[in-house]
Amino acid sequence: MLLAVTLVACGESRAANEGNGRIADVSVTPGSDHARAVPRDSSVLSLARAAGGVDGRHYTVSAQATSGFIVGKIGGGEPRDTSIAPTHDLSACRPFTQSLVPSRDGGVGNSVVWLVGVATGPRDDAPRRVRVMLDGCRLEPRVQRVAAGGTVMITSRDAMMTRLQFLEVGGASASRGTASRGTASRGTVLLNDAGQVVPTSDAAKVAGLVQIRDDLHPWIRAYLVVTPHPFVAVTAADGEFRFDTVPPGSYTLVIWHERFGTRQQRVRVDAHVETRVDMRY
């Protein structure tokens, strides 16, 4: 794992910063605190406890007198297209190719990025209502954010029986792909015809990473990133992300991808300073 972290002062000249005893540009060399691979389950579960309080579930919206910025890029891995050849319900399910690792300019798309340990800050800008579309025997979008307490609208264009399970990633049920007693299921949605629209709020009731998968068609999958605070992002193909108005302090930055697993890195945010974080799978 390679890491480059650069701190750049925002809105002030180098001379002014040096005059105030501050350093405008700081290069941090990877050392004992560099980005590292971590057990998939423990790191993914940190999204559910990424806010403040003893249990990590309490986030307070408040104006910040001072704040900093985090700008980063996720790279590495290999761009991959997966060819799907359905074996049944062929009237709706035709062979298709799906890009699980969209990539442009060396970036890794569909990576989820979040900060752990943020107790207060601006209001979460994640949408409170999102749509997941079943069309051509696949779910779109593959990965998307939704605010905790939001609603997920499941829409079908396929005339076939589908049983969608909502499973917390990191739990035993998600690793097996089935819901069983005592595992972390967030509900089931049944579809049987084109044109159906089924809302569910259970899937987004609390923060966490949720996998959607079909019991009857195992290649049908998608992910919901239920956000605990505003500092959660899903990267586009260029792998870039940005967090504005971050309260000054030290945090753990975690990245996850369904193919590459998880990495995490300690980052420090200072007032009026842009922290640059480049991480590679």
Q: Whereabouts are the PLM-identified features?
A:
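Extracytoplasmic copper-binding redox domains, predominantly the cupredoxin/blue-copper superfamily
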Residues: 10-281
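Bacterial N-terminal signal peptides
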Residues: 1-8
